[in-house]
Structure formats: structure tokens, C-alpha cells
């Protein structure tokens, strides 16, 4: 996995979220496993290269570290 591309994908997701009133769904494909939908809606998240993980900082102060092997990140506009 290319850390630079993942960082760019996370930055794109954050910008895409802002442009669409934070109505996005982030779809994370895990290595040789099922696909999960993780709605990091309105939460601050970033890619940590050293951990190879997504760090999600929830608005209530809790933190989630997604350490699954990430193959790709796709952003979809959520239908309201």
C-alpha cells in the first residue's frame, strides 16, 4: 500500500465531506475480507502512516484507531 495515496484519499474524503455538508460514507475494503461501511460522519479523521491506520476523533472525545489493512478508500455521497 502506498501511504502517500492513502493520505491523499483521506484528505479528499475530508474535503468531499465539507463540500457535501458532512454527508458522506467512507467504505473501507479490508485485506481479503468482507467490505465494511464505516460512517465517519462529521468526525475528524486522519491517516497515521507509522501505524498504517485511520485515526478517528469523535466529537464526544472518544478516539477509534482503525488498524485493519486498508486496500482502498471510496467516498460516496449519502442519500438523504
Predicted regions and their residues:
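Eukaryotic intrinsically disordered, low-complexity regulatory linkers and tails enriched in Ser/Thr/Pro
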Residues: 1-63, 69-80
Amino acid at each position: 500500500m502506498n501511504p502517500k495515496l492513502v493520505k491523499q484519499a483521506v484528505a479528499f474524503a475530508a474535503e468531499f465531506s465539507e463540500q457535501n455538508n458532512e454527508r458522506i460514507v467512507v467504505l473501507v475494503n479490508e485485506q481479503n475480507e468482507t467490505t465494511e461501511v464505516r460512517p465517519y460522519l462529521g468526525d475528524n479523521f486522519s491517516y497515521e502512516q507509522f501505524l498504517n491506520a485511520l485515526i478517528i476523533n469523535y466529537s464526544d472525545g472518544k478516539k477509534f484507531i482503525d488498524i485493519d489493512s486498508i486496500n482502498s478508500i471510496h467516498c460516496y455521497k449519502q442519500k438523504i
